Design a protein with these regions (language model features):
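Glycine- and aromatic-enriched mobile tails/lids
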Residues: 2-206
Length: 206
């Protein structure tokens, strides 16, 4: 299911995830059988591939700031509920971007009381918060840039869908200091095989 990025566009209907599991699970299994042989050894992992992960892990594990994980998580939840709900406007999103930026700065001052490596729920929750905060930042910043309404993004200042200017995927990069870089990618409207026909995008009207 996690492999079905953008298959359903801006708003996936709930039960369609079953199709994702069947289709993409089959594709993943076929690709794995093509690239891996039973009993085949894996090449050694480059140290550079793991050092960045370990540095982040140890930095968070040994954090000795002034703000608790629970406090930061609650601030993030409230900010997203208030400023990144389905119905948004520019003023609300602008304020949300600022608040999430402040919370990201506060994350540098997080406090862990337990530095052990055994059953350390404090560490697990802080690592999870770091991941959630990254997702929250790119979500609200992407929404703030998209000047239209599409799928689950209902922008009250731009109530109509705008295929001419916004028929594109938002791509966001986030660095270790919570600085983001915004980009876009064209939507592929053709299928990758001749088994099915392409379906032209149309407005979803209820």
């Amino acid at each position: 299911e996690a492999a079905c990025v953008s298959v359903h566009g801006a708003n996936r209907l709930g039960t369609n995830s079953l199709l994702d599991i069947v289709v993409f699970g089959r594709a993943a299994a076929q690709r794995a059988s093509e690239t891996m042989k039973p009993g085949e050894s894996l090449p050694p992992l480059a140290e550079s591939a793991t050092q960045k992960i370990l540095d982040r892990f140890n930095r968070i594990r040994h954090s000795k700031g002034d703000v608790s994980t629970a406090e930061l998580r609650l601030d993030m939840q409230k900010a997203m509920q208030r400023h990144a709900a389905v119905f948004r406007n520019t003023e609300v999103l602008d304020e949300g971007v600022r608040k999430l930026g402040d919370i990201a700065m506060d994350m540098q001052n997080v406090r862990l009381q337990d530095t052990s490596l055994i059953w350390n729920t404090d560490l697990v929750e802080t690592l999870e918060l770091d991941n959630l905060l990254g997702q929250a930042l790119v979500t609200i910043r992407s929404a703030n840039e998209r000047q239209e309404s599409r799928g689950a993004h209902a922008h009250e200042d731009y109530p109509e869908r705008d295929d001419k200017n916004w028929m594109k995927h938002t791509v966001m990069w986030l660095d270790e200091k919570s600085k983001s870089k915004l980009g876009y990618r064209d939507v592929k409207l053709s299928t990758l095989a001749n088994e099915v026909q392409s379906i032209a995008p149309v407005a979803r009207v209820y």
